[in-house]
Amino acid sequence: VIPKVFYTADLSESPDRQRLTAWKHAWQTLHPEWDVVTFTLETRPPILNHDQWQQTLDLSEPAASAARLNLLRYEVLAREGGVFVDPDRLPLRSLDELVAGVGAFCSTIASHGASRPHMLSPSVLGATRNHPMLWHAIRDLPHSVLVYRGVWDQSGPGFLTRVVRDHGHFRDVVPFHWAMFEQGEEPAKAHGGAFGFVTAKAAEVVA
């Protein structure tokens, strides 16, 4: 069973604590029985892929924070289980039904160029503790960072898609197809979506 705990993080040098507070409130409101945890550089747990973490210090923003977020995401979920969500995603409905019936799930992304029309995305990623997919991700990540260029392919959607495909996890990781990400609450609801983007003027989207 996927533990009922949500995680997110702002791993920039100057975290936006107001946004983290809004994020925590949004997820807690729709999931009153869940724990909600936020991390910053000061509070994040130790990272197994330490060398890859150190390499992110040479990147510019927002790539640096995005790379660190992915490193943290896979390791926290592997050790603890739960649901790790990007800090720019807010819920439009409860996830209770979904986590009750699966061992792992991930969001999807519609496109990233004509050559890759549909990919898995770690933006919303949930799993039981010690799920093999996550340990495969942790093991494969150093090679991915060495071989590929850009956060997308090193640790993001391109990477997660390869891990699930190459290790046969398409049998036990549920693509969260209806979790369509839209710029605003109403478009997301119209498509049956579960989440919306947080924008500068809409940090309170918590319907």
PLM region descriptions:
Residues 1-69, 85-207:
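Glycosyltransferase-associated regions of secretory-pathway enzymes
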Residues 68-82:
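Solvent-exposed aromatic/hydrophobic patches embedded in short alpha-helical segments
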